[in-house]
Each structure stands twice: as structure tokens, then as C-alpha cells.
């Protein structure tokens, strides 16, 4: 009966001491995993931020460009007076101060580039 008690006590002491070591080891493993998890989260966060910035840039670019399907706004033809500050000359024309023949009008006109 004594040997059974001693054996049981010995097994109990070994189990407790090894279990304690496993507990410390598990704690260290968990700490390492949480640190790795944080680095993965930071990486994923940065990746998501980059994707969002790319999408935002594309959306802003699309807003600034005119659609190919949209009609051109009404424009001023060649030789027609235009406003220097708000030129509405048709494409291929530029709002310029007249040379020679239109000097006395003191106005700007649409001319070919």
C-alpha cells in the first residue's frame, strides 16, 4: 500500500511540475502568436489602405474626365468675340486678342490654334 501511495505521489508531483512547464510554454506561444497576429493585422490594414487609396484615385480621375458619350457644350465658332476670362471657343480654337483688323473693337476673338 505504501508503494502505491509513493508511486501515486511521485506521478502527481511529476504531472504538476510538467504541467506547470507546459503552462509557461503555452503562455509564451500565445504571446508570440498574438505578436504575429498584430503584425499580420498591420500588414492587412496597410494593404487595405492602399487598395482604398487606389479606388479613391480612380474615382476622382473618372469624375474629373468628361465622358466620351457626353455632348460637347455649346461653343463659340471662329472669328466670334469671346470672353478672356471664360473662353467658350470650340475645340481647336483659342480665345486671343485680335491682330490688325480687329484692334479697334478691344475684344477677344476665337482663332485657330
Swiss-Prot record:
| Localization terms from the record | Secreted
Instruction: List the propeptide region positions.
Output: 22-74
Lineage: superkingdom = Eukaryota
Region entry Disordered, spans: 61-83
What is one GO cellular-component annotation here? Answer: extracellular region
| Gene Ontology MF term list | sodium channel inhibitor activity; toxin activity
Presence of keyword Isomerase? no
**What's a Pfam family in this record?**
Toxin_22
Report disulfide bridges, numbered on this chain. 75-90, 82-95, 89-110
Keywords on this record?
Answer: Disulfide bond, Ion channel impairing toxin, Knottin, Secreted, Signal, Toxin
Keyword Secreted carried by entry: yes
- Kindly report the protein's main subcellular placement as a broad class: secreted
Q: What does this protein do?
A: Probable ion channel inhibitor.
- What the record says about its domains? The presence of a 'disulfide through disulfide knot' structurally defines this protein as a knottin.
Q: Which family does it belong to?
A: Belongs to the neurotoxin 14 (magi-1) family. 01 (HNTX-16) subfamily.
Q: What is this protein called?
A: U11-theraphotoxin-Hhn1a
Q: Which organism is it from?
A: Cyriopagopus hainanus
